[in-house]
Amino acid sequence: MTAFVTSLRARPETIVLGKGMTIRVEMPEVWDTVRVETPVTEPISEIKAAALKALYPDDASDADFVVKLNGYEILDESVPVSQTGAIDGSTLLLTFRRRRPVRS
């Protein structure tokens, strides 16, 4: 992974699912980011579940959230991270499936 990616803001701890590649998972609703170290064979659904547990522990259903890479939703979350086009240092966006109203 490049030095640039490791210098980006994220929580100090890393979620370790296995050895392989390091990606960032960003959740704009909570303005937070986690690093995930994962094997390239890990399904996106497992990465999503681990990141949700860390970023949004309010018992939200996995089905309420989508994972995006480069602005596009990853429609089949059962595929390995290596088949999504993600590379070491990529950032996945984890966000609500439906837009939520802004309250002031």
Give the predicted meaning of each segment.
Residues 1-104:
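Ubiquitin system architectures
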